[in-house]
């Protein structure tokens, strides 16, 4: 019985001491892998940053080429009174004289074409 205990204790001590060595080796391997992973991540990050900068430059060029006068000015929506001489109805609408309703306010309203 005593020899079994001594043998078990000896095996246990060896397992613990060798396990610690394996743990240190594993820690070193993990540090090396994380350093390699960081370098890969830095490389990928730099590539992504370059692509984003190129896209941003293209978008800024397109914005600078677009004129401010090319945008549609404020417009009047459907069913809103408009001026016959200066109709500012939104696209798809025309300034027409109403047939039945609206005769008591202004004589022209924006309606669908």
Swiss-Prot record:
<keyword id="KW-0732">Signal</keyword>
<feature type="propeptide">
    <location>
        <begin position="22"/>
        <end position="74"/>
    </location>
</feature>
<keyword id="KW-0872">Ion channel impairing toxin</keyword>
<feature type="disulfide bond">
    <location>
        <begin position="75"/>
        <end position="90"/>
    </location>
</feature>
<dbReference type="GO" id="GO:0005576">
    <property type="term" value="C:extracellular region"/>
</dbReference>
<dbReference type="Pfam" id="PF08092">
    <property type="entry name" value="Toxin_22"/>
</dbReference>
<dbReference type="InterPro" id="IPR012627">
    <property type="entry name" value="Toxin_22"/>
</dbReference>
<feature type="disulfide bond">
    <location>
        <begin position="89"/>
        <end position="110"/>
    </location>
</feature>
<feature type="signal peptide">
    <location>
        <begin position="1"/>
        <end position="21"/>
    </location>
</feature>
<feature type="disulfide bond">
    <location>
        <begin position="82"/>
        <end position="95"/>
    </location>
</feature>
<comment type="function">
    <text>Probable ion channel inhibitor.</text>
</comment>
<keyword id="KW-0964">Secreted</keyword>
<keyword id="KW-0800">Toxin</keyword>
<keyword id="KW-0960">Knottin</keyword>
<comment type="similarity">
    <text>Belongs to the neurotoxin 14 (magi-1) family. 01 (HNTX-16) subfamily.</text>
</comment>
<protein>
    <recommendedName>
        <fullName>U11-theraphotoxin-Hhn1r</fullName>
    </recommendedName>
</protein>
<keyword id="KW-1015">Disulfide bond</keyword>
<feature type="region of interest" description="Disordered">
    <location>
        <begin position="61"/>
        <end position="83"/>
    </location>
</feature>
<dbReference type="GO" id="GO:0090729">
    <property type="term" value="F:toxin activity"/>
</dbReference>
<dbReference type="GO" id="GO:0019871">
    <property type="term" value="F:sodium channel inhibitor activity"/>
</dbReference>
